């Protein structure tokens, strides 16, 4: 099987694709904002000016599954429990899920995650130097952050921090390379690379259940991880293969790291 594949299918059909279980499930969940997606964003109006009238984005969802009918959280966790690799006997090797989500979704996600066998969670807050809520700037404090929740079963997940502290509250990591924007809520590749590098090793499997443009797969490919994604919208899948897939550049340092570790295992450094 190829190392990087974006399936034009629902993650609920994962069995038919015969993919391996994941060390890390990394997904940007639908925030279920519906027609309020662009509510405080200048794009609501033509040219960002309300005197010009509403634009085509007014009262429009980012995509037609961004509501509670189009995306069911209990079903999502039911399938994720099967997609993530089983709890290992040893320590420091357990898998985990990292889900980008809205702050308002925290309690609902934690509830259904616990029911699916993931009672433990760690929140992340990513600080931005800007806010998309420009229209509310003279009315109230505006949001300049994004959130994520890390879920795990019992044992703490694999953690490769290279001896450095990883803060739960950190700066939003921007791309230094200009990547094509294919999806309205596309996350920076550099941020995804940081998370993948921290919670997986070379050749581990990363799965994105709601892949959108496929930047998770691009980030995983750059780091020599195997990655599989699911996306039901054909235009996003086509955009990934046409524009992002050709940009994957495997990191030679990661390959050397893997070769060194393999040799150390042969010599008995790891039990």
Tell what function each PLM region has:
Residues 3-4:
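Short, conserved active-site loop motifs that form the nucleotide-linked donor/cofactor pocket
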Residues 7, 69-73, 185:
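A conditional alpha-helix N-cap/helix-loop micro-motif detector
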Residues 17-24, 35-48, 81, 96, ...:
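Class I S-adenosyl-L-methionine
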Residues 18-95:
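SAM-dependent methyltransferase catalytic-core segment centered on the flexible catalytic loop
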């Amino acid at each position: 099987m190829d190392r990087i594949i974006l399936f034009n299918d629902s993650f609920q059909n994962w069995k038919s694709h015969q993919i391996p279980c994941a060390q890390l499930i990394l997904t940007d969940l639908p925030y279920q904002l519906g027609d309020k997606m662009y509510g405080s964003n200048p794009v609501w109006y033509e040219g960002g000016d309300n005197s010009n009238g509403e634009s085509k984005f007014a009262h429009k969802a980012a995509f037609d599954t961004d509501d509670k009918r189009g995306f069911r959280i209990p079903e999502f966790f039911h399938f994720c429990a099967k997609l993530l690799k089983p709890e290992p006997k040893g320590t420091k090797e357990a898998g985990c899920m990292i889900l980008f989500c809205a702050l308002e979704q925290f309690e609902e996600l934690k509830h259904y995650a616990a029911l699916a066998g993931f009672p433990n969670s760690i929140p992340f807050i990513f600080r931005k130097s800007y806010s998309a809520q420009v229209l509310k700037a003279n009315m109230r404090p505006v949001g300049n952050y994004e959130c994520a929740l890390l879920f795990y079963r019992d044992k703490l997940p694999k953690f490769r921090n290279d001896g450095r502290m990883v803060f739960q509250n950190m700066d939003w990591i921007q791309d230094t390379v200009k990547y094509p924007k294919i999806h309205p809520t596309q996350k920076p590749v550099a941020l995804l690379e940081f998370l993948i590098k921290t919670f997986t090793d070379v050749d581990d499997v990363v799965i994105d259940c709601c892949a959108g443009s496929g930047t998770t797969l691009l980030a995983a490919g750059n780091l020599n991880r195997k990655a599989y994604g699911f996306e039901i919208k054909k235009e996003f899948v086509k955009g990934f293969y046409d524009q992002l897939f050709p940009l994957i550049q495997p990191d030679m340092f990661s390959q050397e790291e893997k070769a060194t570790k393999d040799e150390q295992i042969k010599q008995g450094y790891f039990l």
